[in-house]
Structures are given as structure tokens and as C-alpha cells.
């Protein structure tokens, strides 16, 4: 099997994604039934962090251990990557001592260069541009709660960040629509818009209009990592883009609310919504664990028969 990476959502076909979702359900059921499943015994995951994280580290490290393998944590401050070693050189060495690599960093270019020089699969744990593992978990969570996402409408409210970018890619691959509402100056990046089928998304000035009839309403923090200096300015700019009960009430009555966490109640979402009956954020967070186990299994072992 040729080396397969997961650097952007569109790296996988619809068929591959459906397979990963199917495997996620099976693996999750094994976990919930306390059935040991160790297909990655004696395999090693190296996790490289330039951006700190709770959920990404925990889900990958625990997931690898639950599949029988081991995980090694590296951060750029304590490794040669933080001392100027070329990414290409690091990839050559690290990939000779591991079976799979997950990287959480700032620039997409870094992970692309690493993958180009790696002998093993590379997973994007998050970059400024994309967050494919999170959207994988989000879509799986929607399927668990409401069924197939094809033909549905996702409302994105807030910053057109890596999450928004990845939702747009996912809409292309899995055939659904995204309604996007952002404050002026925080819109979808022009270079990305040109790559997306215009039938897959629509931009709204008013977040209420974006949520109207939506099947899934989602948002993220107003100030992502690396943009802390803009925090006060962003709080003012995003004040009208807080997902509240009124927005959820104009959505489909069966709509669910998602947030990749951590959340700031009273900023991007009200407590009424995130702690309310339509919120599935805790299942969404847990599903990072299970969907990434299925992802790692597929990247290392290919399709499991039977």
C-alpha cells in the first residue's frame, strides 16, 4: 500500500471517508464493550506539537494506546525542530523511527514539507489553514445523531478560520451545503473561495439568516492561537456573531449545535446553547478519540476485511 497522508479533508475520497466512519462505529463499540482490539501492537505514533493542545494530544495518545501501540510526544521547544533543523531532515529521521506521525503546527506548508519527506503516514492535527481531524469527528457525530449529512445545511457563524475552511472542503467531498456568516474583514480567504464549488456554500451578512433552516450550527473561538494580540479588537468585531437561543430557534427544529472546544460562554456561544438540549459538544469531543483510531488504522493497515 502506497503511503497515504491526511493533511487536508479533501485528501480522502467520499468512499474512504465512509469506510473510516464505518470503522469508527465498530472500534467505538469495541471500546464501549470493553473488548480489547490491538491492531497496532508494536506500532509507534510520534506526535509533534508546535501549538499546545488538550484534546488533540489526549485523543491521539490514548487512541494509540487503546489500539495496542505507543505514542511519543515531542514539542518544538525541546527538539531540534525548534533549533533550526530543516523540516525535511527532521522528517527523514523521525519517519525512520516511527510508524505514523501527527503534527499540530501553525503553517500548512510545514506539514506539507514534512509529509513530502516522510516514509510513513502523516496526519494534520491542526494548522492555521485546516483542521481535518476535527471535522472528521464533527461529521461522524452528526451521522450518529441525525444520519447522513448529504444534502444537509451546516451554518458556520464566526471567524472564517481553519475550521470554516475545512467545512468548505468537506461540503465538496460529501455533498452538503455550508452557510457562512462572518464579520467584515474576517471573511473566507479569497484564494480558498476560488477552489470551492459555489453551489456548496453561501455567504450571509446576518448570522441569523445563515442559521435559518440549518441542520447543524457550529462556531469556534473568536481568537485562535497565534492571534492573541488581536483579542480586544476581535471581541468588538464579533459581538453580533454569538450563537444564541434565537439563532438555534430559526434553525431546523432537529438541528444540533457543535463547537470544537475550548469554548468561551458569553462570547462565541451562550450557555443556553452549549449547555442546552441541542448541543452535542461532549459526544463531538469524545468522537475525536474514536474517529482518529479508525483513521490511524486505515493509514497504517489499509482496509480491514470482514
Curated annotation (Swiss-Prot):
- So what does this thing catalyse? carbamoyl phosphate + L-ornithine = L-citrulline + phosphate + H(+)
Compartment list:
Cytoplasm
Keyword Nucleotide-binding carried by entry? no
Q: Name one GO molecular function term.
A: ornithine carbamoyltransferase activity
Q: What is its EC number?
A: 2.1.3.3
Quote the record's binding site residues for carbamoyl phosphate.
53-56, 80, 104, 131-134, 260-261, 288
The organism named in the record is Dechloromonas aromatica (strain RCB)
| Entry function | Reversibly catalyzes the transfer of the carbamoyl group from carbamoyl phosphate (CP) to the N(epsilon) atom of ornithine (ORN) to produce L-citrulline.
**Signal peptide start and end residues:** none
Q: What family name appears in the similarity comment? A: Belongs to the aspartate/ornithine carbamoyltransferase superfamily. OTCase family.
Which residues does the record give as L-ornithine binding sites? 162, 220, 224-225
Protein's name in the database = Ornithine carbamoyltransferase
Primary localization:
cytoplasm
Q: Which GO terms describe its cellular component?
A: cytoplasm
Pathway it belongs to? Amino-acid biosynthesis; L-arginine biosynthesis; L-arginine from L-ornithine and carbamoyl phosphate: step 1/3
On the tree of life, the source organism's domain of life is: Bacteria
Please give the PROSITE patterns that the UniProt record associates with this protein: CARBAMOYLTRANSFERASE
Picking any one GO biological process from the record gives:
citrulline biosynthetic process
SUPFAM superfamilies assigned to the protein according to its UniProt record, in alphabetical order: Aspartate/ornithine carbamoyltransferase (SSF53671)
Q: What UniProt keywords are attached to this protein's entry? A: Amino-acid biosynthesis, Arginine biosynthesis, Cytoplasm, Transferase
